Amino acid sequence: MSRLNPRQQEAVNYVGGPLLVLAGAGSGKTSVITRKIAHLIQNCGIRAQYIVAMTFTNKAAREMKERVGGLLRAGEGRGLTVCTFHNLGLNIIRKEHARLGYKPGFSIFDETDVKALMTDIMQKEYSGDDGVDEIKNMIGAWKNDLILPPEALENARNPKEQTAAIVYTHYQRTLKAFNAVDFDDLILLPVKLFQDHADILDKWQNKVRYLLVDEYQDTNASQYLLVKLLIGTRNQFTVVGDDDQSIYAWRGARPENLMLLKEDYPSLKVVMLEQNYRSTSRILRCANVLISNNPHEFEKQLWSEMGHGDEIRVIRCRNEDAEAERVAMEILSLHLRTDRPYSDFAILYRGNYQAKLIELKLQHHQIPYRLSGGNSFFGRQEVKDLMAYFRLIVNPDDDNAFLRVINVPRREIGSTTLEKLGNYATERKISMYAATDEIGLGEHLDSRFTDRLARFKRFMDKVREQCAGEDPISALRSMVMDIDYENWLRTNSSSDKAADYRMSNVWFLIEALKNTLEKDEDGDMTVEDAIGKLVLRDMLERQQEEEDGAEGVQMMTLHASKGLEFPYVFIMGMEEEILPHRSSIEADTIEEERRLAYVGITRARQTLAFTFAAKRKQYGEVIDCAPSRFLDELPPDDLAWEGNDDTPTEVKVVRGNSALADIRAMLKR
């Protein structure tokens, strides 16, 4: 989009106070944010180092930074901060760690670490870990709401909350002892720091002269307060959001934060972006009519100049197998007729469990696909091993990292030895790593085991010393060679080819660390800082990003589709108790499910189809399914219903298979 429309231009130019840009789906909000940053630097005299733009994903931050770079002259963007909320929080903690009582090089615990630590606490305190996931979620919710352990304990209303609050108390104490933080702490700790230390708050407010926040409807209580504290009394900010696309209440997001802005900033200006640059008028009318069933503080109507468009198809299928077969055949047929690449097609669904059947059908028809939510790069065992070594180098107090690497490769140090080492370290109030070469450990362990532990510590101390030198990357490469990790992989992989692939991931990780160090603009980043950034990237990018333009039908949940767009979209499982989800019906939170359907609809550029099954297997029984209430809320004149006649879907599928066999035979000539 080379030129801005009048509403977009208004949002870019306004710098007279607080601004809310209510940006509908596909309305060009990224263009507004990036042009506004350029406008602030080039026309308003605000230096880039005093501008901070925050979003929720690394991918969005990267795209934003690249687009801003294309608008600025050389050197104009130096010092500009475009990052995620959690990256900003990490930077604040890194710079203010002493005031928070942390040592340099603190660790960031990922989901696996957090669950392992909570499980350990529950087994010690309650002789079992039943309900650890529920307790983990409760503690996460408390942190998002800025509730610390004493307050959680005081306000516990039932035995379950009391148990969670006690675990929370032990958990925070242990985290601090490990010199570690978790993902939620990256927001909680900066907020508490700013609230308790006016001098630090003043320092950071002076660093942030203008603040921009994307996807504001996804902020939780702690993120809202972090923004409010950074803004202070200056009131120079632009937030961009869409109340109709708030679909993350389950992880603490509060769409009401958009309404709170009007109370907290009475002079707030609101600019609505309603022109859509993505979808046909018909698709947008369906989206507008559907979402109008939700109550609104801000009324908006999306419109476009992309043509009227085809009818929206609603396809009834006899059962879930026929539904999956129908979608696969529709995609194959459209691909053959239009010659459009498979990557132009998206299959969206409410839950990952729906993917298996359609995946099998796509495989059967030899249709390539990309399944979002697969194994992440950082989730691979070899990468987790090396990351644990990195973490131990950065933070010798990280017991979780120590326990992961002590026997990778095998060092003949058994669980009994480690248990005795752990008990000794707890008595001495030191880390397990620090305890490995203490003389007093000999009173608890045979000399064979103390020698092995001390040998490991000497080796790691040497690596740490080398990493503090001029070439830490070479030191890490040497470490991998010295522990003979490649041989360990060959012993523990299904084939030499698998071992080679896993080893290539190890070298790739070290190269990523090298790139992080080399890209540091300020030149003051240490290897510890670079590892901290990698650990954070691990958590922010749980799934490996697909390469651009990857061939294959895109399969993903409705939640994962947010922010994406495709020419052809199929939304499967449009049934009561699937969309809307059963739990939402029971909890009377239908509005969020409606927003989820709205997000799905507005992913489509040209063609949209809904499918649902008349019957579905559930717990071994065949049940009747009711079409989703959301289908009844759509404008009937824009819908074309199919599959309501008496012809069995299976017969149609056989006919379709026969026709496609003929086409394939013709193509092979």
Named regions from a protein language model:
Residues 1, 638-669:
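Acidic, low-complexity intrinsically disordered tails
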Residues 2-13, 17-21, 32, 52-53, ...:
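Conserved helicase NTPase motor core
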Residues 24-25, 56:
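P-loop (Walker A) phosphate-binding loop of NTP-binding proteins
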Residues 27-33, 97, 266-269, 274-368, ...:
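Helicase P-loop NTPase motor core
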Residues 31-47, 63, 67, 228-230:
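Walker A/P-loop NTP-binding motif
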Residues 40-56, 339:
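Conserved SF1/SF2 helicase motif Ia
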Residues 50-138, 151-155, 166, 259, ...:
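Conserved P-loop NTPase-based nucleic-acid remodeling module centered on helicase motor cores
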Residues 157, 341, 355-367, 380, ...:
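Conserved helicase C-terminal RecA-like lobe
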